[in-house]
Curated annotation (Swiss-Prot):
SUPFAM superfamilies: FYVE/PHD zinc finger, Hect, E3 ligase catalytic domain. It comes from Mus musculus. A zinc finger (PHD-type) spans 79-128, 141-195, 237-286. Ubiquitin ligase activity is mediated by two distinct domains, PHD-type zinc fingers 2 and 3. The use of these distinct domains may allow ubiquitination of different targets by each domain. The HECT domain is catalytically inactive and does not contribute to this activity. This is G2/M phase-specific E3 ubiquitin-protein ligase. One of its GO terms (biological process) is apoptotic process. It catalyses: S-ubiquitinyl-[E2 ubiquitin-conjugating enzyme]-L-cysteine + [acceptor protein]-L-lysine = [E2 ubiquitin-conjugating enzyme]-L-cysteine + N(6)-ubiquitinyl-[acceptor protein]-L-lysine.
Amino acid sequence: MNENKPDNSQSLACVFCRKNDDCPNKYGEKKTYEKWNFSVHYYCLLMSSGIWQRGKEEEGVYGFLIEDIRKEVQRASKLKCTVCKKNGASIGCVVPTCKRSYHLPCGLQKECIFQFTDNFASFCWKHRPVQAITSNKYSSSLPCTICLEFVEPIPTYNILQSPCCKNAWFHRDCLQVQAINAGVFFFRCTLCNNTDIFQKEMLRMGIHIPEKDASWELEENAYQELLQSHDRCDIRRCHCKKGRDYNEPNSKWEVKRCQSCGSSGTHLACSSLQSWEQNWECLDCRRITYTSDFQKAPKHPLANSTNVTVTDCLLEESSSKLPRQSTVAQHKELLRQGSKFRRDISTILIELGFQIKKKTKTLYINKANVWRSALEQFQSQKFNPSCSIDVVYVNGNEVGSQHLGSKQEFLSHLMHHLENSSVFEGSLAKNLSLNSQAVKENLYYEVGKMLAISLVHGGPSPGFFSETLFNCLAYGPENTLPTLDDVSDIDVAQIIIKIDSATDLNILNSVISQHYNYLEVSGCLRLTTSLSDKFMLVKDILFYHVINRVKAPFESFKQGLKTLGVLEKIQTYPEAFYKILCHKPENLSAKNLSDLFTIHSVADVQTLRFWNSYLKAIEDGKSATTMEDILIFATGCSSVPPTGFKPSLSVECLHVDFPVADKYRNHLVLPATNTYEEFQENMDFTIRDTLRLEKEERSHILPRTLNVSSNEEMLI
């Protein structure tokens, strides 16, 4: 008959600590012995100060004789715990001058150290061993190398540092769980695999390393699943009607596995992948890759990132096969990525730019209709967003009238059109509009794709998103609260204002009756029994008008933003993208603009002095020209793109009467004049006249007016 009866383990408390808890990681294995009518935690027995292992392993309890256990329990019953003030404190601090005694759980609560080696010494919270505190060279938190949750890199009771790797930090609980699973033969530093130094330090700091084989070595067919390939779509929203397990090679329903872990997969169609894309990584692997690269080289974050590959994809869930972070932990980490890493937006976009291939695609753009030209080129089946882009400007139907153009200038013109197009509404901070013609032509998807391509290929930042639109993209519509500022329709805004300003229930019901049809069709009609109901009614109308009403355009817009993995980066680093999607770049100062230009060849000292004086005069408002005008004249862009100018800006002084700009090379030639007045006059005249002519050249663009549904107007 087996003396250990697990079924009774809950009825008998441990004879030492008087707790029923069965927690092997904290107290060791709990065993109940029916023959002697007691239960005991392994660690409580092992750490008791007045008992020694006098029997063989198979005798008594773990080699401790039963009579010795009873004597130790009797001895402990006379000792009061320093923590809980109850009797039974069988463990005492090993320091001779210290008189503290405690139960094992109380000692753990007070952060005592129990050494599972040699004489199994116990140290109270005053005399416990500590790790040396070195100078903290880390400006922010670092991840625990086991669970990847962030810790402050300062050694404490709960945070331990590896003795052999300065960058390896651990939670105490994570180390203990790993030690129990790995055993003495496989427990080692997670970074350098050192065993001797690492185990010695961990034993000193109270980590129990059992003398057993690793748990995975004892499991039958532990590695059997490694022989199987993963053929399941793990994307959050699988669009395959035949289910996640359906896999049809050489079709859009072929399952592509993560190139790094192989334990997550996606249908090509579910992640908007094309057949020409060979690589795909799941969200877990991409997050680890970028975290590792950023931690290793904060000054040069791109130096070791050549293997990074990002593709269009939905936000995936972790594969159920991998024991990684919990869903809650992943969600928290996702929301705090920006604040933890403080990643610069240029670094993120440059990483996305690693996908761009050397193979080029030439876009033929009519300056008089940039929008329609770009739309035709991007909708072409041969267009590949991961190819490098060359731009050639054509002049209508004039044969032979074409010249090489600046890609960044083209993208700048395209962003200007998108900002003022019919797919957005609002004055400065814009939301998506409801445009039936745009839905029919799939323009919301195309606009999203254009924005993504512009950001990755070095174009300017949009800067016109409303905070509500951005929050919908980054955190989801369900976590977004629209405001009255998001309502650009005057009639709807008046309804909301009337309801919100109602001072009694009769006035509120009168307003509801007046706009009954609109409230009913929009799904916002509700029974109002008190004046306070108006707040929920206003909230419902705002959510319907700003979010639910444009649900289909929003989903299409999101699909477009998934191009080149941009949407996923927005959701991973919302803080970084908020600055470029919702805010225009700050105005350039004279010094900032001057610093953008590199002096080319030998410069004329006087001309450079005139140039700096000219910039200063513009900054002081003494010229009709602006800093933005100079930037447009030299590059075609009204602001500095998030990834900077490629090629970098250069300035040259030549013996010419008027300034000359080469936007393809971002090169500016300054005129050589005898006086500053002549220099300023020539610069002002040329820049303003050139910009005026270019504006006239682009004046014949696609009309903006695409009306909303007449049914909605009738309802309002």
